[in-house]
């Protein structure tokens, strides 16, 4: 079934576990399930894996600073960071640890640094520390700020490399990926799950794991027999701009104090040293079809970008930014609301022994992917055997 869509003329294919969604989280979940000896098939709507939310990110390995104590984001990010860096080392995937600065540009923002410092220490980020403006200037002379948090554990990673390694692991364990297989409906009951795809195929399994990202809400609502909770869906588009004709201006990743809906327009670099800034937050209609979203960069947002960046980098040259790419984050909290936790619902939440739903897997989803895989296997218990 690998690399082809399921066709109508094929019989209904039965497996232990179907994973809907071939992003980095879906592949990590499928790999974790396959490692338990279960048969796993990933159903991916696109022509290749990891091309939607996964490929339109900042490619950052987060330390675990921003998230409330005990939240899934806190627990899975800290655990996932350790798993991911070890996984990259074992599989030859490139990554490195430049560290991150979260910069308070004035005294009014320093209280927020204290809150983040407490969160980080509570969550187990032991190397996180606050620095004053003098040390900040020593580390990054061109960054303007009165204080900052220094996170040595924050890194960057070749996300495409991780996606490729996860897929190879899955297939080596006997799993498969069915591309061009968009789930449009199905049914779930005590005997298992059957799903239908837009391409005319069907598949059945003992357990379904819904990792469809932006489309997870649609998949859940399309399943006859499922009457469990589905959280609200909010979509936050984030534009990125690259620094034209110049390499990274800083040695560290540089973030502002977080803003409503995101972490603020921050500076990151890729492993080749190319610099980019983003994402901003552009709220979209939460009822938009996941297949019809506009990923073009909104160039009219450039002046706001420049203004945000110059708060911590006054030396940004005029005309230095060029459109790079845009991503869309699946969220369960909207404008003006506190950032929501990951929603990973198993039988204890919705009462369906054959289904696990994942909603709102935004940042730090990439960092957390392997830990999410572990967590989902724990929720499944013995149901997929």
Please place each PLM-identified region on the residue numbering.
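Short beta-strand to alpha-helix junction loop
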Residues: 68-79, 103-112, 149-168, 296-301, ...
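Central helical "cap/lid" subdomain
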Residues: 50, 199-251, 295, 382
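Dinucleotide-binding Rossmann-like beta1-alpha1 core, especially the glycine-rich loop
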Residues: 59-135, 145, 264-265
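Glycine-rich FAD pyrophosphate-binding loop
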Residues: 35-56
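N-terminal Rossmann-like FAD-binding beta1-loop-alpha1 element of flavoenzymes
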Residues: 15-42
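Active-site lid/adjacent beta-loop-alpha segment flanking the redox-cofactor pocket in flavoenzymes
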Residues: 226-235, 247-337
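Flavin (FAD/FMN) cofactor-binding core of flavoprotein oxidoreductases
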Residues: 134-137, 232-238, 300-366, 371-374, ...
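Helical element adjacent to the flavin cofactor pocket in flavoenzyme catalytic cores
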Residues: 149-207, 218, 370, 379
């Amino acid at each position: 079934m690998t690399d082809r869509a399921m066709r109508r003329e094929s019989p209904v294919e039965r497996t232990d576990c179907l994973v809907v969604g071939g992003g980095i989280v879906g592949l990590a979940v499928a790999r974790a399930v396959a490692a338990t000896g279960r048969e796993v098939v990933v159903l991916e709507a696109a022509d290749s894996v990891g091309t939607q939310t996964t490929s339109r990110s900042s490619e950052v390995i987060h330390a675990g600073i921003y998230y409330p104590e005990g939240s899934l984001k806190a627990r899975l990010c800290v655990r996932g960071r350790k798993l991911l860096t070890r996984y990259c080392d074992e599989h030859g995937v490139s990554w490195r640890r430049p560290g991150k600065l979260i910069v308070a540009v004035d005294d009014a923002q320093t209280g927020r640094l204290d809150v983040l410092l407490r969160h980080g220490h509570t969550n187990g980020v032991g190397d996180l520390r606050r620095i004053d403006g003098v040390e900040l200037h020593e580390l990054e002379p061109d960054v303007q700020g009165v204080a900052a948090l220094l996170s040595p554990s924050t890194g960057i990673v070749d996300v495409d490399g991780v996606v490729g390694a996860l897929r190879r692991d899955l297939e080596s364990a006997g799993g498969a990926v069915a591309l061009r297989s968009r789930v449009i409906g199905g049914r779930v009951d005590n005997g298992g799950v059957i799903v239908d795809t837009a391409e005319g195929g069907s598949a059945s399994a003992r357990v379904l794991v819904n990792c469809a990202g932006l489309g997870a809400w649609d998949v859940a609502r399309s399943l006859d027999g499922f009457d469990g909770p589905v959280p609200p869906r909010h979509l936050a588009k984030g534009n990125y701009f690259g620094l034209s004709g110049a390499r990274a201006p800083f040695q560290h990743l540089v973030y502002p104090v977080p803003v409503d809906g995101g972490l603020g327009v921050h500076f990151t670099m890729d492993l080749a040293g190319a610099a980019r800034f983003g994402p901003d937050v552009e709220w979209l209609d939460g009822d938009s079809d996941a297949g019809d979203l506009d990923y073009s960069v909104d160039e009219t947002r450039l002046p706001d970008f420049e203004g945000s960046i110059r708060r911590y980098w006054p030396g940004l040259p005029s005309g230095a930014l060029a459109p790079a790419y845009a991503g869309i984050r699946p969220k369960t909290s909207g404008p003006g609301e506190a950032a929501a936790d990951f929603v990973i619902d198993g039988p204890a939440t919705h009462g369906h022994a054959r289904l696990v739903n994942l909603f709102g897997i935004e940042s730090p989803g990439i960092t957390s992917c392997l830990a999410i895989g572990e967590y989902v296997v724990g929720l499944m218990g013995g149901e997929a055997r």
